[in-house]
Structures are given as C-alpha cells and as structure tokens.
C-alpha cells in the first residue's frame, strides 16, 4: 500500500512539471550594457573611412546567440560600393539619429563570397557575400526611431546618407557562427586604439 501511495504521489508531482515548458537557456543570466559603454564605441569612428561597425556584446541565449553592435556611417552620396549579405545572421537596425536610404532584397547582382579570413566574417556577420547591386530591391528611408529587420540571406546596400546615421544593431545568430563577447572583452576592446582588435 505504501508503494502504491508513493507511486500516486509521484504521478501527481510530475503533472505540474509537464505543464511548464523548459526554457531554451536554462539558468542563463541577463546581459546589461550601459549607455556610457555604447557612447564610448560611437566615439571610436575611424576618420579615414567614416564607418564604424563594432560588436559590443555577443551572448549565448540558448538556442541562438544574440549580439549587440553599434554602427556609425558618415555621409554617402552615389551609393555604397557593395551590397552585403549574411548567410546565417539576421540583423535588426534601430536608428538612433541621422537618416539614410537603404535598398534590400534577395536578388544580388554579381554576388561573390567573402573570404573566411575577412574580419567582418570572423567577428561580426559570419559567412556571406558582396554584390554590386540588388535587382528589384525595396527602398527604405530610415530616420531616428525607425527599425529595419534584415533576415539572413537578404542583401542590403546604403545608397544615400545625407550627413550621418547611427544605429544600434541586434544580430541574431541561430547557428552560433560568430564568437561570443562578454563585458570584459568589450572593455578590453575599448582600451585599444580604434580599428585594432
């Protein structure tokens, strides 16, 4: 009788556990990035290029990695020299200030694979390619407060930046192709001269 009661008790204890799904990131901790750190990255724009795309954090969130980058792009007229495309990483842009025109679409003209040794491939976006233009692309006029979601495999090309654009970038990396970067690594990057990794 005692064994029967223990068995019934075990069944009743297991029922609530079945109702609650298991999180994909069991016992993970949250990641906090203070505004001061983001601003420090924005101040590191290389004068010679006028473009700065810097990974602030890349964290394991269970089934996917999520990275936060901060990007500055200076004035551009006449279009970017290339289209960018990332095979596995989707990007979300949240415009902080400035404005720009960007064209997006999957049909990339003269697509060529980026070398695996490329710093952006290794540290920011994972494997992907470049092209000269986007056939039948969609034009977006970005301004402060706007959000643009660019799924993996979709080409994107800035065609006009009147003065500048600054945006926070969220990179979604379900295949975990880009290395993780914690707060300590971020602070170490900030101690280095801009452009050095």
Residue spans of the language-model regions?
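A short, N-terminal "cap"/entry segment at the start of jelly-roll beta-barrel domains
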Residues: 15-88, 180-197
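Short, solvent-exposed loop/turn positions at domain surfaces
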Residues: 89, 136-138, 144
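Conserved metal-binding segment of the jelly-roll/cupin
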Residues: 140-162
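A short hydrophobic beta-strand segment most commonly corresponding to one strand
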Residues: 163-179
């Amino acid at each position: 009788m005692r064994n029967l009661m223990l068995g019934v008790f075990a069944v009743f204890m297991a029922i609530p556990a079945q109702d609650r799904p298991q999180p994909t990131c069991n016992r993970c901790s949250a990641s906090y990035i203070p505004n001061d750190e983001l601003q420090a990255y924005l101040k590191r724009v290389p004068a010679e290029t006028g473009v700065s795309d810097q990974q602030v954090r890349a964290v394991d969130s269970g089934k996917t990695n999520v990275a936060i980058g901060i990007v500055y792009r200076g004035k551009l007229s006449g279009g970017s020299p290339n289209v960018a495309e990332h095979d596995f990483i989707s990007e979300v842009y949240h415009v902080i200030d400035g404005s720009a025109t960007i064209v997006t679409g999957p049909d990339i003209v003269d697509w060529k694979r980026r070398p695996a040794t490329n710093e952006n491939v290794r540290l920011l976006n994972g494997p992907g390619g470049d092209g000269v233009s986007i056939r039948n692309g969609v034009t977006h006029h970005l301004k402060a407060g706007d959000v643009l979601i660019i799924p993996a495999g979709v080409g994107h090309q800035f065609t006009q930046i009147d003065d500048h654009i600054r945006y926070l970038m969220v990179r979604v990396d379900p295949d975990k192709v880009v290395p993780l970067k914690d707060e300590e690594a971020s602070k170490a990057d900030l101690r280095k001269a801009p452009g050095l990794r």
